[in-house]
Amino acid sequence: MRREALWDRLYLSGIDGRAAELARENGLGLEIAAFCYAPNLEDPAVLSAVRSDMAGLDRFWFHAPFAELAPCAIDPLVRQVTEKRYRQAADLAQDLGVRRLVIHGGFVPQVYFPEWYVEQSVLFWRELLAELPPDMTIA
């Protein structure tokens, strides 16, 4: 495959503070990673910085928070927090005009039996995905 064929599918992770600048210089997409840390979803300063990073770019992935979030949690309260944070991420991505989200499934083999995980995943994701815009991609 030629280099040009891949170029429009390459994204730099915003974890690196220079990612937006490098993406602009090289015609790459940007993965917005500032919201991997859930409290940043509610921080106006972080949102402002992300908007600045997005300037001059046109291809994005939005990385939702994941630490301590578990869609298949045994504890219903943990599941509620997870749902809240994922909804916040999807809403914020939409507000930013981003239609592609990275959301971790939360499988921890030392904690969940695979059967439980699959069963609970279907319940969790069916409800959440039904509320997202049809043009939004979750990976």
Regions found by a protein language model. Give the residues of each.
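Active-site acidic/histidine proton-transfer and metal-coordination neighborhood
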Residues: 73-139
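N-terminal pre-domain/capping segments
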Residues: 1-88, 94
